[in-house]
């Protein structure tokens, strides 16, 4: 059974139109400083790899803090398309300059639906459409804002999120157990 819904652009469901991160150098991780989210910290599946966590010492970093319902996208290089939907359980982060932030409007869509949509084959096929041969294409904020997104009804979005969240939460617990066992 095919779901009824509508196609929208990312810009249609966001509060902002895509904001580039802070252009600052990373420094060794210091819990007294703000954690710095870089492209290299984001895995292809949208989870974080903080084994080489860094901080940022720039006083302007406060203006680049991720907030609930924010999603960031990698815009360049072999990581183009990687994305991370901010989860406060991961800690506080300022996002780096090679990331583009969009703030999802919860009045228009279940923001976590967008998190999962941006891990779908539909999303990754859209990203791949910018590739040229073996080179991943760059995607700027304007292009990301035009990204097509299929929106089922809010009820269906909530149902999809409920299922995906239960799987994500289980993976998160398993990863913590694995980290504990390998420590």
Short names for language-model regions:
Residues 23-31, 129-131:
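Short coil/turn segments at secondary-structure boundaries
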Residues 86-87, 130-133:
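Short amphipathic beta-strand starts and helix->beta connectors
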Residues 1-20, 146-183:
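Non-catalytic DNA-recognition/assembly elements of restriction-modification systems
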Residues 7-26, 35, 40-71, 86:
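Sequence-specific dsDNA recognition surfaces
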Residues 93-99, 112, 132-161:
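A short glycine-rich beta-alpha junction/loop motif
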Residues 119-128, 148-150:
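Well-ordered mid-protein domain cores that form the structural environment of catalytic cofactors
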Residues 38-39, 59-119:
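A short beta-sheet element
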């Amino acid at each position: 059974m095919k779901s009824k819904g509508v196609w929208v652009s990312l810009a249609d469901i966001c509060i902002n139109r895509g904001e580039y991160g802070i252009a600052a150098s990373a420094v060794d991780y210091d819990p007294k400083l703000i954690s710095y989210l870089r492209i290299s910290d984001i895995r292809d599946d949208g989870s974080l790899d903080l084994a080489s966590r860094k901080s940022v010492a720039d006083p302007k970093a406060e203006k680049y803090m991720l907030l609930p319902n924010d999603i960031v996208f990698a815009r360049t290089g072999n990581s183009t398309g990687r994305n991370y939907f901010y989860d406060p359980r991961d800690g506080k982060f300022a996002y780096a300059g090679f990331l583009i932030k969009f703030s999802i409007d919860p009045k228009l869509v279940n923001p976590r639906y967008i998190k999962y949509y941006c891990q779908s084959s539909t999303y990754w096929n859209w990203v791949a459409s910018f590739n040229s041969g073996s080179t991943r294409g760059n995607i700027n904020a304007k292009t990301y804002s035009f990204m097509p997104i299929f929106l089922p009804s809010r009820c269906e979005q909530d149902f999809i999120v409920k299922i995906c969240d239960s799987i994500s939460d289980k993976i998160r617990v398993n990863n913590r157990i694995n980290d504990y066992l390998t420590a």
